[in-house]
């Protein structure tokens, strides 16, 4: 009796304990989905002890729980979904090494691995441009951009002049705490003279001598992204005057103000100013200011607090940088026109379309059409479809005669043949943009909604003297 018990015990042990040896039937493991291989008594035979939810000799099928009346059915390897992080399981005759797995995981953006279990570090490919700092997130990343850049990848520049120097910002938008009066009140250094590079005997703003807390303020008329400021001094009665240091404040309503702080502290930032009366000095704001009003508070001045200045930045949405008319990035051959005027019918005084560049200098420094009618146009080929969000126009003088475009329409095209005139969405008719009122002041119009096109045409609608134009387009080339 004892001998028979021992025999049965040995048999039970041989059946219940997996034997793993070199060349064993269980090496490699033929059981899938974590099944345990149990060698059989006969050579080459085995059985699989399957985990819960799997069945078949190799544990390759998933048990689907059915209703009481139905028999359990096999749902395949994709139920339940073995893929993590929203991965999609697809049936496939795929192998992992020597093992047939029966499925593959299609991973969403930002994940990889057999089961989409790994978060990809997107910062490894350095997606942030122009000095942006990348932070890896779950299935994503973010870029901390320098003040003068913006966009998902810091790809958009945001440091164009906002219009103090060019005149887009009007006299009424520039105010100050006080005005200096000299020569028995005959000389008045008003705040609206505080325009960068302004010429003349009185060419800057100066605060009154008894003003203990002077400031100068710019009303941008809408909330904008301000990324920097350029300051400049001036000479008064032959004496250099300038601001050596200053603080900046900003507001959205002109009543409640916040001082610009040193990043990460509650300390007011003191910006370095000028060292002479004429050299411009620029400071950038990182992070940028988003506000309608900007104030500059002089802290230390040489003699009197005297200032010429320009604000830098862009619209809140970004994508409002000069596209290259003034800089020359847009080349001469890209600018064409309906007709050309020659003063005194002389070739040396030909007002060609390539000269229609904002702030162009010289005797012949703009485009003038050969005819004064509403069929004239100036065209710019941007070479690729471009997002155009604004336009700046300017007139010129022909031998002392003031000439400018008082109003205009815009048209756009992608092939240069089929044109669409920009519409006023509210009135559902062609939009007529307000142009210039003199030969030199910049006039900016925002194009909202923007134009997406390769070719842009300016269609003069009214004019003074002759149709004469200098211009700049604003926008950006769309990037993913």
Swiss-Prot record:
Cell compartment(s), UniProt: Secreted
InterPro entries: EGF-like_Ca-bd_dom, EGF-like_CS, EGF-like_dom, EGF-type_Asp/Asn_hydroxyl_site, EGF_Ca-bd_CS, FA58C, Galactose-bd-like_sf, Neuropilin_MCO_CoagFactor
Binding annotation for Ca(2+): 119-120, 122, 136-137
GO terms assigned for molecular function: calcium ion binding; integrin binding
Entry GO CC: collagen-containing extracellular matrix; extracellular exosome; extracellular region; extracellular vesicle
Domain F5/8 type C: 158-314, 319-476
Signal peptide as annotated in the record: 1-23
Cited Pfam families: EGF, F5_F8_type_C, hEGF
List of glycosylated residues: 73, 88, 140
Disulfide bond entries: 26-37, 31-48, 50-59, 78-89, 83-105, 107-116, 123-134, 128-143, 145-154, 158-314, 301-305, 319-476
Motif (Cell attachment site): 96-98
Keywords of this entry: Calcium, Cell adhesion, Developmental protein, Disulfide bond, EGF-like domain, Glycoprotein, Metal-binding, Repeat, Secreted, Signal
GO BP field: cell adhesion; positive regulation of cell-substrate adhesion
SUPFAM superfamilies on file: EGF/Laminin, Galactose-binding domain-like
UniProt domain EGF-like: residue ranges: 24-60, 74-117, 119-155
Role: Promotes adhesion of endothelial cells through interaction with the alpha-v/beta-3 integrin receptor. Inhibits formation of vascular-like structures. May be involved in regulation of vascular morphogenesis of remodeling in embryonic development.
Domain topic, free-text comment: EGF2 and EGF3 form a rigid rod via an interdomain calcium ion binding site, while the long linker between EGF1 and EGF2 lends considerable flexibility to EGF1.
PANTHER family: EGF-LIKE REPEAT AND DISCOIDIN I-LIKE DOMAIN-CONTAINING PROTEIN 3 PRECURSOR (PTHR46806:SF9), F5/8 TYPE C DOMAIN-CONTAINING PROTEIN (PTHR46806)
Protein name: EGF-like repeat and discoidin I-like domain-containing protein 3
Organism: Homo sapiens (Human)
Lineage per the UniProt record: Eukaryota, Metazoa, Chordata, Craniata, Vertebrata
Gene name per UniProt: EDIL3
